Amino acid sequence: MPTINQLIRKERKKVVKKTKSPALVECPQRRGVCTRVYTTTPKKPNSALRKVAKVRLTSKFEVISYIPGEGHNLQEHSIVLVRGGRVKDLPGVKYHIVRGALDTAGVNKRTVSRSKYGTKKAKATDNKKK
């Protein structure tokens, strides 16, 4: 433990918090252009074809982003909105594409957790008899 004189001579170092999504540059989301849309396989215990896209952000970073949900309409040159959030079983994927924003369509026939997948509420059919 330092003495008061030691603290006067040299103050304590501030702990700098390292961001987990540096490409967003202090912003909640960033716009970007898809440069490549492809599938990749996850790490060892899991097995699937995960849909990902390489995105060139407005902050000049080129990042790999995960496309959540079943099915998508993205292709090269699509304009997308990217948020932070990693995918645990895909190394190097630290960003998610926001569904239902800009060129990205929402997930079709989604009934639960719709806000996460950009799906509008389905029209209520009149099944009740009056």
Swiss-Prot record:
Task: Please give the InterPro entries that the UniProt record associates with this protein.
Answer: NA-bd_OB-fold, Ribosomal_uS12, Ribosomal_uS12_bac
- Cite the Pfam families for this sequence: Ribosom_S12_S23 (PF00164)
Q: Which stretches does UniProt call biased (Basic residues)?
A: 111-122
Instruction: Tell me which Gene Ontology terms the entry assigns under biological process.
Output: translation
Gene Ontology MF terms in the entry? rRNA binding; structural constituent of ribosome; tRNA binding
Q: Which cysteines are joined by disulfide bonds?
A: none
The record's Gene Ontology cellular component field reads: small ribosomal subunit
For this protein, the record's SUPFAM superfamilies field holds:
Nucleic acid-binding proteins
Q: Which UniProt keywords apply?
A: Methylation, Ribonucleoprotein, Ribosomal protein, RNA-binding, rRNA-binding, tRNA-binding
Q: Which residues form a coiled coil?
A: none
Q: Which PROSITE patterns does the UniProt record give?
A: RIBOSOMAL_S12
Q: Which residues carry this modification: 3-methylthioaspartic acid?
A: D89
Region: Disordered, residue numbers: 110-130
Keyword check for rRNA-binding, yes or no. Answer: yes
Q: Which family does it belong to?
A: Belongs to the universal ribosomal protein uS12 family.
Read off the NCBIfam families from this record: rpsL_bact
Q: What does this protein do?
A: With S4 and S5 plays an important role in translational accuracy.
According to the record's subunit comment, the protein's assembly and interactions are: Part of the 30S ribosomal subunit. Contacts proteins S8 and S17. May interact with IF1 in the 30S initiation complex.
Its protein name is Small ribosomal subunit protein uS12
- Which species expresses this protein natively? Helicobacter acinonychis (strain Sheeba)
